[in-house]
Amino acid sequence: MPAYKYNRVFLIVMDSVGIGEAPDAADFNDEGAHTLGHIAEHMNGLHMPNMAKLGLGLIEDIKGVEKTEHPLAYYGKMQEASNGKDTMTGHWEIMGLYIDKPFKVFPEGFPDELLQELEKRSGRKIIGNKPASGTAILDELGQEHMETGALIVYTSADSVLQIAAHEEVVPLEELYRICETARELTLDPKYMVGRIIARPFVGEPGQFKRTPNRHDYALKPFDRTVMNELKDCGLDVISIGKISDIYDGEGITSSRRTVSNMDGMDKVIDTLGEDFTGLSFANLVDFDALFGHRRDPEGYGRALEEFDARLPEVFEKMREDDLLIITADHGNDPIHHGTDHTREYVPILAYSKKHKKAQMLPLADTFADIGATIADNFQTNKPKYGKSFLSLLQ
């Protein structure tokens, strides 16, 4: 096996943790957005001593986050090059792919012609058709669904079409078949939906409960990613959280589902104790799903502090030849108008026990610099986009 600078790379994406408006924020109606900064102000200071030690406070002024004189990590920020601010666009770019046309979101619900075709093909009526929290819409429409057999269709601030059905009303196989039909219909460029999600549930009105039989029908990345290159070279690519869904399983050698940020951190810490060579790639979605979209700066702030408190466990289990990269995929400022993501810079922190004198990284004009660096480290084919910063890490 070739000698790699780092035998294992641990990449953690803090979903939606932006660090200030991007230069093109106005094009996305996001002027003034600053996810981390606004949460810190709302909390009258964030308590993130471990991220501070890495150098977070040196990237931007964040209330409560100390500016250390001796950062442990190389630190900086990255600007998104792709034309979009959703999860798939951000993650695909991290691994070397650009999206020219953003995935579509449906804040007013899906077009009638799409739903009429889905009703025709499925033989079932559709109710809902609006952005909603998955649990709230069951409380609202679950009983009607049980009485009529109509499908509950809803969306979120992301590019998703979700179909909820009671397992005793619509058998799982039928629900999955309907979702496959929806996937096929929404490949049409005029819809361009990132993901279709089957959301089965059980229980009685007032006590509905979603089951683990959720199934995602994503789009395959339009081209090869750095993960495909790693896998083809016989390296491990371990997915933690929704990474496998985001890339539709492409380039992944093993996948671990998570139920929360803390479960995600448990899984990261588990992989630190395993022998492998390659990439462990984790997404911590709670920041975005539970707090960003719901415009809950208090909950978001607490989640950031909980994440920070787990980092010493990560540091302790890291080996000399491990590299930890912490970043984000877009912003979702809970103080901002609306409930959508925000077009922001994202932070990047790159830490290894072997680094002697960490310093600031040059401003990256694409998230793909991360993928390029990982490809460079493992001596695989380079992605079309991105510039490796591997040689800067000393």
Curated annotation (Swiss-Prot):
Cofactor requirements of the protein:
Mn(2+)
Query: What Pfam families does the entry give?
Result: Metalloenzyme (PF01676)
Q: Does the keyword Isomerase apply?
A: yes
The entry's Mn(2+) 1-binding residues are: 15, 329-330
Q: What class of enzyme is it?
A: isomerase
Task: Provide the E.C. number(s) assigned to this enzyme.
Answer: 5.4.2.7
Instruction: Tell me the InterPro entries matching this sequence.
Output: Alkaline_phosphatase_core_sf (IPR017850), DeoB (IPR010045), Metalloenzyme (IPR006124), Phosphopentomutase_DeoB_cap_sf (IPR024052)
Under NCBIfam families, the record lists:
deoB, PRK05362.1
Protein name according to UniProt:
Phosphopentomutase
The protein's organism comes out as Bacillus subtilis (strain 168)
Lineage, uppermost ranks = Bacteria, Bacillati, Bacillota, Bacilli, Bacillales
